[in-house]
Amino acid sequence: MKYINKKLSIEKVAIDSIAKKYNTPSYCYSSKQLRENIINFKKNFKTFSPMICFSTKSNTNTTLIREISKFGFGADVVSIGELMMAIKAGIKPKKIVFSGVGKTSNEINYAIEKDILLINAESESEIKEIDRIAKLKKKKVHVGIRLNPN
């Protein structure tokens, strides 16, 4: 953000004009700043060759996720809606991790059908359900197991 002609602006667009057009409160994203942040983030972790997953529960803006996907990011999703949205926004299924408690059979089935990278299981019953559905579909599924030592 910077002042242009005494008006606070984002990428040469005056914030007051955004407020007039879209009302307040509003969220504004700078695609230029987003790209710069992504490039810097990836550069700083380059030696580790990580697969970076954006947490879609933190922001479900499809345009934002589509932009992030252009840089090879994956997605960490917690519902079938987020999973569908991530795929629609251009995230490759093999770069999607499905976390979250209480996944339904329908959600697990859809995740397996889409051949996502990993399903994080939150309970013994969820592990059994993933196994049951995977066997029915004759598919191998990568499963992460979350443990709480307490």
Where are these regions (language model features)?
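Flexible glycine-/small-residue-enriched beta->alpha junction loops
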Residues: H142-N150
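A charged N-terminal "starter" segment
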Residues: M1-I119, E124-H142
